[in-house]
Amino acid sequence: MRGKFIRRKTPLIVFEGIDGAGSTTQTDLLFKYLKSKNHRVIKTCEPTDGPIGKLIRRALKHELKFSWQTLQLMYSADRADHLDKLILPAVNAGKIVISDRYFFSTLAYGELNLDGKWLRELCKNFPMPSVTFLIDTPVSVAMERMESSRGSKELYERKNFLDKVRKNYLKQAKEFSFYVLDGTKTKSEIAKEVLEILKKKKFI
């Protein structure tokens, strides 16, 4: 599966990883750094805070129940709205966009319960990000982080499930040329690697 890349002066930067890997932390750190350097930048995430994204978040917290297929259709609808209303207008306006998760999450998580070909068909028209960072974190480390920061587990937060998700992400890393970062390093060490890569690619 190969969607069109976003080719603009400013990039779409994506962070991926299993729950507890640190993608949200790295999104926040990069956003703060770029703001401090007076870059025009926005940060966002999936699921979004839009109407569909809010329903997905309720499902993840076990407040609503949908079939796996329905949930992935909702993710795709949320993403399409996300691209149309925020990501593409921002990139076209010359702003750097940093997203905590993108369609790679659909493939990594969704393929455990649904047909991979069907999921890829859902995702095939979504544009490729300019660069994707996979924070590869052992499940035991991620689970420990989540247990210390959250009171209850979300829908996908089970060890055997996350082990498989991690393997799916590593397969995607080869297919989509992710930059794979060691999630056991400190957050500052990872952030430094991210900046080095972005500067080398002349995105910042």
Predicted ranges, named:
Residues 23:
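Conserved lysine of the Walker
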Residues 12:
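Walker A (P-loop) ATP-phosphate-binding motif of ABC ATPase nucleotide-binding domains
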Residues 101, 106-167:
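A glycine- and Lys/Arg-enriched "phosphate-lid" helix/loop adjacent to the NTP-binding pocket
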